[in-house]
Amino acid sequence: MKRPGFKFVKTIYTPSSGTNPELKDAKWFFIKRDNLETYIGCILDKDDSNHTAKPIRIWNKDGTECTVTFESSPADAKLYLDTTRDNYDILTVQDTSIITNKTKAVAALPTPPTGTTYVANSRGTVRIKTVAYSIKYEVNLKVGSTNYPVSFTTINAEDLTAADSSSNPSDEKYNTAKRILDSLKTALDALSISGHTLTVTKLDSSLELSLKTTGSGTPYAAFELTTTDSQGGIHIDAFTEQVGTQAELPAQSVQGREAKVVALGGANETFWLEFFADDGTSGRGSWEESKDPTVSDGLNAATLPHELFNSASNTFVFRQPKKADGSTLAWKGRVIGDTITNSNPSFVGTTIQQAFYHNNRLGFLTEDNVSMSKSNDFFNFFYTSALTSTDDDPIDINCSSIRPAVLHGVLPTAQGLILFSRNQQFILFSDAEILTPSSAVIRGISNYEMDPTIDPVDVGTTINFVSKTPSYTRIFGMQTRGSEESPVVMDIGKIVSEWVPDTVNNLLSSPQNSLIALYGDNRSTYVGDKNIYMFKTYNVGDKIIMQAWFQWDLPGNIQFVSVDSDTMWSVVEGSGKYHLISASLTQTPEETIMTTADGQQINPHMDMYTAATNGLAGGSEKKVVYDSAGDFSKCYIPYADLTTRNPVILIAGNASQDFAGVTEFGFTVNPTRATDSDGTYFKVIGKDLSAQAANVYVGYQYNYDVELPKTYYRLSPEGAQYDYTANLTIARMKFAVGLSSVVGFKVKSKGYRGELAEFTGDGSTTAFSVPFPLKEENGIVVKLDGAKQASSTYSVTTTDAQATVTFNTAPTAASTAANVTTPAQKIEITTDTWYDVQTAQDLGQYLADDVPLTDSSVFTIPIHQRSDNFNIRVFSNSPFPVALTSMMWEGQYSPRFYRRT
């Protein structure tokens, strides 16, 4: 089938001066919110003066540039954009695109945390365990090298003096914790500690002490706290920071009191608790798990992936990820444990290579590690508790192998998460029903080399990836079979081995169309190609009924291509200008430009097709203008003329409505091109098309050109055996076509050469005229010293009688240097010996003034040659579709060898 034409949407970027392709090194991406919001964007070099203000540009599907703002607080978001195109990874989900800089090493926040007031052992707790008579309760503070002891002795139980607690509390006859604590607090408050201030808070059964430095500087000061009593310390105890078990902590304390529980298991079982008072100040409350106040609070958000947030239609903001309120940072820090019980994720200190979503988790690939966030908490990579592990805790797992494994690609499948490194592939899965830290397993599944700069893609149930050689590209297909089985891997590019060049650097897929495509984009180190290499399959159940490789030639240097549903979007560059174009991959277009009398809807098969206009607004807009003096129509184009392409115009309309408002529906012609003060236009001589201005479409021809392989006799109905040695004489070929218009057939026979002209280079002449036409469809051959030259090294202008070939660089003249004479370059210009074959068709009928299309036709091509003596091509460059459905042949088959019967 002839490829669809690309519709011109808009010129989205024009260079500041000249024809320099200023977006050539950009990282391009595609965002699909819904059918109304579709965007194409790119990340540029912020250090380039042309892009300093806008290092990210985004356009909607109409080609209108969107507003992109860059937050500068808490850090300048632009600083994150400091690398090249291959070092960005972009992951889009709904309204948020996660942008990862693969060269940015992730850092933790400072240790100790910035602004912390915590000083180890600057707080203490004195707890009365039991109240006894005639006991001396002692408390000693040691600040520096100085001891500050205080004590209180309880009354003797035999003292029978009458008590008068109302008038003289110190004469109280009963021992109470309150009396002991009051006395100790009074004594502690009376201490004079040079350069320090001691604060004592009395609770029901304990005293809380804190020591601060007087004046500026460190607010808190460390001290040693010890207690004893006259019976060996069984009635009173104290601690500053550490306890052996949680049971040693008092039921009452002050808000924010922190304590470290050092269990028998050592550092791996140590945890921190913080007291939260019921009234927010002191008294009763609860001890809750907290983090070590001396360790980092978490991750430095400025070094982590940033988000491109679609805040409104055509409006984006680039920033550190934030919560739904738009002000609170989304990255969560460490809230419990320390660097042992709640360590940093493995990507800290290294670079993140790719981000992904899987099983309701955000994941990162770093070196040979896979890190996944807490379940349903995408920006949290720290544990819930230092005491136990939960199923929703983060997953951090290593895929160590005997081969170097630096992960750079990931794709989810029903069997698990497929991980890709340069030399090996892995699967991350869980034998349990859900993926948890304890059930996650990584296992190697295959060992294929792949290009680390081209991400793998999935096409339905198949995964495709590429491997580069010094001269061409291999393409593999992988189908997983389960966590315990190796996948089935096929070299799907074997049939076109060495056809796909090594310059491709992008791979995309369209699962609903069973299609993959490869292309090389425009960049400083490589001028963008105009070709897309595509592979399409047709499956019925588990069987591949048909598969084919083919190539599309786009109207400009390809910068970006993406397929959304059944629409292919592309950005192409020409003379420094960037055009947004689109094509429908189905026969039913989204917009109807032409409808035949029997209701068939088609779009023009022209490149850069658009309604005639010069692209200006208001009274300056010109569409179709008739010049009565010269008797020609000017059909204006809204973009820079593609001088290497053949222009074409087409009259659109709707034949199913009795051609209402249309007088020449389906009329097409190849015009000439010209320019005036209103812009560039296509010139149609001898016709006044101004009355049809709304129906005039302008664009460029492109070729549908298929060279068929050799024909051999099939020995078995299944097509498993062919007779390659037999003498096969083809009498005629019959081609069945579907919905099609003009189609031609060309044959090249051995021993036949077209007209030839020879010249000799003189070092200055670049243009050489030949006395015969050179038609692209017949094949043009230009040789220098016998070597065929690429079409990009010369240009051709032709008429019906002659043609001129103009070289980009003049062929060299004869020269002599160091007694060595180099002859002048010999120039040969000829055709590729393809000639048109007139077909035979049955008589038919058509509706006058309708588009020249038929639902089905059969063309009979006379050949009368041996199958190895000719080649045949199917060719069309009309602005209408062509659908080749089948081919049959008639002829004489004669086996060459005797056979036993």
Regions found by a protein language model. Give the residues of each.
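Elongated alpha-helical scaffolds
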Residues: 85-106, 417-420, 427
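Short linear interaction motifs
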Residues: 21-24, 70-88, 329-353, 399-409, ...
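Extended beta-strand solenoid/passenger and fiber regions
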Residues: 118-125, 593-667, 702-741, 748-793, ...
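Surface-exposed interaction regions enriched in Ser/Thr/Asp/Glu
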Residues: 217-221, 286-300, 322-329, 333, ...
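Beta-sandwich interaction modules
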Residues: 84-89, 401, 406-409, 685-690, ...
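Long, charge-dense tracts
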Residues: 89, 96, 102, 122-129, ...
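Beta-sheet-dominated scaffold domains
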Residues: 399-667
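N-terminal beta-propeller domains
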Residues: 1-61, 251-406, 470-486, 747-751
